From Swiss-Prot:
This is a cyclic peptide. The presence of a 'disulfide through disulfide knot' structurally defines this protein as a knottin. GO terms for biological process: defense response. This is Chassatide C4. It comes from Chassalia chartacea. Residues 1-23 form the signal peptide.
């Protein structure tokens, strides 16, 4: 029984370590600084136009018209 408990502990510890490593990788995004300082009114292009006043890409808005842009401060764009 002690051997099983040790193996279970090691398995759990390895899963926790993988979670910690993946969260560190996310925080080291080289584009994060660029995305955070983008002007919300003049963000990155979403690749579509909004002649009808609507953008179909998630996280994009029709500002400035007629180009859909993504707000660099929205969590969806990060």
């Amino acid at each position: 029984m002690a051997k099983f408990a040790t193996q279970l502990f090691l398995l759990t510890a390895s899963v926790v370590m993988l979670e910690v490593q993946s969260s560190i990788v996310i925080m080291q995004d080289p584009d994060l600084g660029r995305k955070l300082i983008m002007n919300p009114a003049n963000g990155a292009s979403c690749g579509e136009t909004c002649f009808t006043g609507i953008c179909f890409t998630a996280g994009c808005s029709c500002n400035p018209w007629p180009t859909c842009t993504r707000n660099g401060l929205n969590p969806e764009s990060i």
